Amino acid sequence: MIYFDSKLPNATTTIFTIMSNLAREHKAINLSQGFPDFNANQKLIDLVTVAMNNGFNQYPPVEGVLNLREVISQKVNELYGTYYDPNSEITITSGASQGIFTVISAFIKKGDEVIVFQPAYDQYEPSIQLNGGKVIPVYLKGADYSINWEEVADKINSRTRMIVINTPHNPTGTIFTKIDLLRLESLVKDTDILILSDEVYAHIIYDDQIHESVSRYPKLVERSFVVSSFGKTFHTTGWKTGYCLAPKNLMTEFRKVHQFNVFCSNHPIQHAFSEFLKCSD
């Protein structure tokens, strides 16, 4: 038998895979993963067919279809008041998970520490470990799963390379407030700490709450990656299409890894989202 050391000795099949298999086996309603029990908009589905029939079946640009990046730039600017250059600050990814892994792979090296709020989406920890980093957990507190920012401050040191935030939060559903983002901004001021903001549930928010994107805060924007997904918003999780926003100097490093990770993302689907978003609120 060939001997080797596992890079993830404690990792097993994800709970999402286990629960989804059980749901299929027993024809049960699946509440374990973030996808709906109804189909995507038929117009969006038809637009994929149109794109394929129009010949968009070969490799797209590594950074993604420009028309889609331009639409994303416009939408983000309208929502949060920050302009991201579609040429140099937006990259289309093969889902948010690929974007998250690419950010971590581009910047985390052996000995780096990454603060992660727990409980957390189960991708963060193994992605950090695979790149030699160390997860520093901060546990959300109380019935409202709030953040103890004093604890965060205590855990920041010279080895802290990144803080991962996720709002609206998976799995608790808690929403970061303006006060939270301002506290974060204050803590990382005058440091080289990067922020990875997972915002895949940004448009799935209720009770008149407001999504406080990192993109609303200029001092955070300059050190942050914002990762999002069309799958959650438009009920197309199997299409694995998302995007990443970051200032040019950070996005340059992201794209270096992205090109060797997936090279590019699904071509006709990008054109479909581009056209669909142009006529969507």
Predicted segments, located by residue:
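Short acidic capping loops at alpha-helix termini that bridge into adjacent secondary structure
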Residues: Y84-I90, K110-E113, R159, V221-S224
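A short helix-loop-beta submotif of the ANL/AMP-binding
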Residues: L130-V135
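Short strand-turn motif at the edge of the Rossmann-like AdoMet-binding core
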Residues: G34, P119, P168, E199-Y201, ...
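Active-site phosphate-binding strand-loop segment of PLP-dependent enzymes
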Residues: I136, G142-D208, E212
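N-terminal small-domain helix-loop-helix segment of the aminotransferase-like
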Residues: D5-G95, T102, F276-C279
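PLP-dependent aminotransferase class I/II
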Residues: R223-D281
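Conserved PLP-anchoring active-site segment centered on the Schiff-base-forming lysine
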Residues: A106-I128
